[in-house]
């Protein structure tokens, strides 16, 4: 999609969102040459702040190829925000409902029309204590295998310094630098002739996330952990510790009662 076809609603959103971004933040944008000039494609982006969709959208808007985000369906229900979401062609995600596959179909359709669909593969803000990308969901992998379109990894850093994950108190000053870096397409060709089994989807997802993490290492100038943070594993470990604590407490109580 060329800049001439961006449309009224996306231009309106840009008019509203760009001025505060320009005033509040400095920019360090790299890798724009990797954003395809034509044809449908996926961008896969790390997620570490509630405001990083705006900083990333600003980056890509300036390439002339606007992204279609997958966003929770509640944003499409009422008010001005719903009008903007619908008008800019964002894609609602209906989690755990009979409409859950609609987002997949809509993403595939958008790519086949020559548009860009932006995925946050982690599905939510990272829970990694040091804000590295964590284990991801398979949505981007599914669409990539279905369409065989280019998958552009994107790393971003800086919005999280202004508004950390799960924080409600922004710290805009001193001005932070929004760093965004796109990389070359992830080579997924070895998966194209395979059935999208859970194992294949997991491997494709890990390949995409490895590319994002490598870019973020370059942006941050430091090494990521060898193993991505796994929130499910962390929750299980917390439950095990809680269960051990409960068992220990019960044993000690029984010992006291028998005295």
Q: How should each PLM-predicted stretch be described?
A:
Residues 36-97:
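Catalytic core of membrane glycerolipid acyltransferases/transacylases, capturing the structured
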Residues 105-109, 178-210, 214, 218:
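A charged, well-structured terminal subsegment
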Residues 130-199, 229-235, 239-243, 247:
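A cross-family acyltransferase "interaction/gating" segment
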């Amino acid at each position: 999609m060329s800049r001439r076809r961006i449309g009224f609603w996306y231009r309106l959103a840009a008019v509203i969102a760009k001025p505060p971004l320009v005033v509040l933040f400095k920019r360090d944008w790299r890798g724009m040459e990797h954003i395809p000039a034509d044809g449908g494609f996926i961008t896969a982006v790390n997620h570490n702040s509630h405001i990083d969709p705006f900083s990333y959208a600003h980056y890509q808007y300036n390439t002339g190829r606007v992204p279609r985000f997958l966003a929770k369906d509640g944003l499409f229900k009422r008010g001005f925000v719903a009008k903007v979401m619908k008008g800019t062609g964002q894609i609602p995600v209906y989690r755990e409902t009979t409409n859950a596959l609609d987002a997949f179909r809509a993403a595939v359709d958008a790519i086949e029309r020559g548009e860009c669909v932006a995925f946050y593969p982690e599905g939510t803000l990272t829970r990694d204590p040091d804000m590295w990308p964590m284990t991801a969901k398979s949505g981007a992998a599914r669409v990539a295998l279905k369409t065989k379109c280019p998958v552009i990894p994107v790393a971003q850093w800086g919005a999280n310094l202004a508004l950390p994950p799960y924080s409600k108190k922004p710290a805009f000053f001193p001005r932070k630098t929004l760093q965004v870096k796109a990389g070359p397409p992830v080579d997924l060709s070895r998966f194209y002739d395979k059935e999208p089994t859970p194992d294949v989807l997991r491997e494709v997802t890990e390949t995409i996330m490895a590319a994002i993490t490598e870019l973020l290492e370059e942006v941050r100038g430091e090494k990521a952990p060898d193993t991505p943070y796994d929130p499910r594993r962390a929750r299980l470990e917390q439950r095990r510790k809680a269960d051990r604590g409960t068992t220990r407490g019960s044993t000690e109580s029984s010992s006291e009662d028998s005295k």
